[in-house]
Swiss-Prot record:
Identification of the protein by name: UDP-4-amino-4-deoxy-L-arabinose--oxoglutarate aminotransferase
Encoding gene (name): arnB
Enzyme class: transferase
Modified residues (N6-(pyridoxal phosphate)lysine): 182
Keyword flag Lipid metabolism: yes
Catalytic activity: UDP-4-amino-4-deoxy-beta-L-arabinose + 2-oxoglutarate = UDP-beta-L-threo-pentopyranos-4-ulose + L-glutamate
EC number(s) stated in the UniProt entry for this protein: 2.6.1.87
Function: Catalyzes the conversion of UDP-4-keto-arabinose (UDP-Ara4O) to UDP-4-amino-4-deoxy-L-arabinose (UDP-L-Ara4N). The modified arabinose is attached to lipid A and is required for resistance to polymyxin and cationic antimicrobial peptides.
SUPFAM superfamilies: PLP-dependent transferases
Amino acid sequence: MSEFLPFSRPAMGVEELAAVKEVLESGWITTGPKNQALEQAFCQLTGNQHAIAVSSATAGMHITLMALEIGKGDEVITPSLTWVSTLNMISLLGATPVMVDVDRDTLMVTPEAIESAITPRTKAIIPVHYAGAPADIDAIRAIGERYGIAVIEDAAHAVGTYYKGRHIGAKGTAIFSFHAIKNITCAEGGLIVTDNENLARQLRMLKFHGLGVDAYDRQTWGRAPQAEVLTPGYKYNLTDINAAIALTQLAKLEHLNTRRREIAQQYQQALAALPFQPLSLPAWPHVHAWHLFIIRVDEQRCGISRDALMEALKERGIGTGLHFRAAHTQKYYRERFPTLSLPNTEWNSERICSLPLFPDMTTADADRVITALQQLAGQ
């Protein structure tokens, strides 16, 4: 059998090794100059005024919700077809996640679904830029402005995604992920961008014990060695080891995403003759980052179920992923919201399958996946 082809693999090279070596030899390995450089680089990428690096996108979501003072009695609108961390953070703060349906073919939450879910208790809207494509963020922000509701963009899939000529996050507040399978990675990490100076100041405090400044700031700027605790906070800072890797990856972003796009195009051409349905692309002008390549496996149409397809691919040495099982079908949320029905979300949750997609894949690797799909479709 051929070597196992994983669903994803980080694209690491000598540059990342050199970046880590530099940090280790510098004597400053926790939050420091590499964090500052990463934040500045993201501001240049997105055009935002502020960037705050954190230990994970989940941490970023947690402190953003906290900074917006979301808590008991509040509602936050978000799709169910997302990773559960968003729902978990909303719930842990005592608020209620209001899960809405998505478009059947793009898997994007729609402005119409969001607006229909607004109540006097709605405190925030969290759209997801799904799989590397952008949601219709102008329309969603317009709803937020009309009702006076904050919009927090879940941009975990969207490093390198553009909407109408603007990088995701521009002129708003968005949270990116540097998890191991993301378009750029430092194993674990995240980053928040915003143009809201007050929000940025609160996020910096909340991510580091509620202190007004961190240790590197105190050393660099000659401040008093004992900083003041201004509010209870968390330990969500990113180390410079991680930041150095992320910064090196960011410099490669165009190359990494170009390779993802080439593989996605190879899949798209082959799938035109197969019953497996890829996601539709959004109608608005955009640049897709191709974080994921997702097909829908409908048993009646394809002659095989999604789970059987994933198992058959595994037997052929090909890994796959599931992004995502709908959050409202998970035990905790199913029991909390037993009557919730989201038809498009549920239909897709039972059929979606993520194919291998990462920059170090070869054309032959993609051909191997395509050949297996052709065999399993009976063609």
